[in-house]
UniProtKB/Swiss-Prot annotation:
<keyword id="KW-0539">Nucleus</keyword>
<keyword id="KW-0028">Amino-acid biosynthesis</keyword>
<comment type="pathway">
    <text>Amino-acid biosynthesis; L-methionine biosynthesis via salvage pathway; L-methionine from S-methyl-5-thio-alpha-D-ribose 1-phosphate: step 1/6.</text>
</comment>
<protein>
    <recommendedName>
        <fullName>Methylthioribose-1-phosphate isomerase</fullName>
        <ecNumber>5.3.1.23</ecNumber>
    </recommendedName>
</protein>
<dbReference type="GO" id="GO:0005737">
    <property type="term" value="C:cytoplasm"/>
</dbReference>
<dbReference type="GO" id="GO:0046523">
    <property type="term" value="F:S-methyl-5-thioribose-1-phosphate isomerase activity"/>
</dbReference>
<dbReference type="GO" id="GO:0005634">
    <property type="term" value="C:nucleus"/>
</dbReference>
<dbReference type="Pfam" id="PF01008">
    <property type="entry name" value="IF-2B"/>
</dbReference>
<feature type="active site" description="Proton donor">
    <location>
        <position position="267"/>
    </location>
</feature>
<dbReference type="InterPro" id="IPR000649">
    <property type="entry name" value="IF-2B-related"/>
</dbReference>
<dbReference type="InterPro" id="IPR042529">
    <property type="entry name" value="IF_2B-like_C"/>
</dbReference>
<comment type="similarity">
    <text>Belongs to the eIF-2B alpha/beta/delta subunits family. MtnA subfamily.</text>
</comment>
<dbReference type="InterPro" id="IPR027363">
    <property type="entry name" value="M1Pi_N"/>
</dbReference>
<dbReference type="InterPro" id="IPR037171">
    <property type="entry name" value="NagB/RpiA_transferase-like"/>
</dbReference>
<dbReference type="InterPro" id="IPR005251">
    <property type="entry name" value="IF-M1Pi"/>
</dbReference>
<keyword id="KW-0963">Cytoplasm</keyword>
<dbReference type="GO" id="GO:0019509">
    <property type="term" value="P:L-methionine salvage from methylthioadenosine"/>
</dbReference>
Length: 391
């Protein structure tokens, strides 16, 4: 059964509440752009592609409701202005992820173009927006599968390590990933986790390793949930164990293949290849370089921001202190009776200062390739990415 995080039919949108995973599976309805803003900001939905799609579809639902109840203006410019204001509001929910801003800009241009057509009414402008937002859902799944296939092929061609041939003679790889980049972070299949899924589908994956990803634990809560759901051989490690994992030739249950590649997603890729992603990504890239392990970024072209020249220009979101000092989960059941009620506990000394950036920036010099839906972009002989060539 395929894991579905976003369910949509015209006029109806539900998201899988990721704050409750892996212990509860609850779908929250979103009726408006305001509902989506709160869901994104509270991280009930997260992942750069997913938040862009949820934001776009939430406004589609709101517009459909207004149109069917005759509450939309007949004036196309008024409806266009309403849509642009709602899109601007949605972008403010998580400023680091470029997909959201890119989608808002693209949808805004479609709306402006439709509103300027002579004889068009307000409902038709809304309809143009709704159709464009709905296409985003289908396009993302298609793009993710292409990313998975391209990435898997590149890894097998470039990242096979000594000892990576199984007893059957088939090349197999072990891959480490960070945060969550699967069906929960996209419309489906995933980016970095999509590569892992593609490797597994062809029998080429020995084992996937996922980091816990403190402080929000997207790895232990979400990626581990997806890997178990898909019956992919996987091992969870804490963030601080990554260096030790790369340093040894074998690790984990039934493991005989050293890690060949670290594959991560991205929230924004600058024009030069500098990559903003979940905090801890930069450290993994440094470790990969030291240990001679390939480091790959998997992201659709919508994540590449050609208007941002380098990573120094990327705004890094900072999250509340309590995300570091507290942790939430169900009470462990007594005497094998399962899980108890959800509780929040404190894990830090009272009064300690906290710095909690949600993302860091990995320099392009540490990235071996950027996996997109149109192929893997590598650096030229002088170590420079030419990302403009894929647009």
């Amino acid at each position: 059964m395929t894991l579905v995080a976003i369910t949509y039919t015209r006029g109806s949108l539900h998201i899988l509440n990721q704050l409750l995973l892996p212990h509860q599976t609850t779908y929250d309805p979103l009726h408006s752009a305001r509902d989506a803003w709160h869901a994104i900001h509270e991280m009930r939905v997260r992942g750069a592609p997913a938040i862009a799609i949820v934001a776009a579809l939430s406004l589609a639902v709101e517009l459909h409701t207004l149109a069917t109840s005759n509450q939309l203006s007949a004036e196309p410019k008024d409806v266009g202005q309403l849509i642009l204001e709602k899109l601007e509001f949605l972008v403010s929910s998580r400023p680091t992820a470029v997909n959201l801003a890119e989608a808002a800009g693209r949808l805004g241009r479609i709306v402006n173009g439709r509103a300027q057509v002579q004889g068009v009414g307000g409902n038709e402008v809304a309809e143009a927006y709704i159709e464009a937002a709905e296409r985003m859902l289908d396009d993302d799944v298609r793009d993710n599968r292409a990313i998975g296939e391209s990435g898997a092929k590149w890894v097998l061609e470039h990242a096979i390590t000594k000892g990576s041939i199984s007893g059957t003679g088939q090349a197999k790889v072990a891959v480490l990933t960070h945060c969550n980049t699967g069906s929960l972070a996209t419309a489906g299949y995933g980016t970095a986790l999509g590569v892992i899924r593609s490797l597994h589908a062809t029998g080429s994956l020995e084992r996937a390793y996922c980091t816990e990803t403190r402080p929000y634990n997207q790895g232990s809560r979400l990626t581990a949930f997806e890997l178990v759901h898909d019956n992919i051989p996987a091992t969870l490690i804490t963030d601080s164990m990554a260096a030790a994992l790369l340093a040894r030739q074998s690790a984990g249950p039934a493991q005989s293949v050293g890690v060949s590649a670290i594959i991560v997603g991205a929230d924004r890729v600058a024009a030069n290849g500098d990559t903003a992603n979940k905090i801890g990504t930069y450290g993994l890239a440094v470790l990969a370089k030291y240990h001679g392990v390939k480091f790959l970024v998997a992201a659709p072209r919508t994540t590449i921001d050609m208007n941002t020249k380098t990573g120094a220009d990327i705004v890094i979101e900072e999250r509340p202190e309590k995300e570091v000092t507290r942790i939430r989960g169900p009470r462990d059941g007594e005497e094998g009776n399962g899980l108890g009620a959800m509780e929040t506990i404190t894990v830090a000394a009272d009064g300690i200062g906290v710095w909690n950036p949600a993302f860091d920036v990995t320099p392009a010099a540490l990235v071996d390739g950027i996996i997109t839906e149109v192929g893997v972009v590598e650096k030229d002989g002088s170590g420079v990415f030419h990302l403009e060539r894929i647009f």
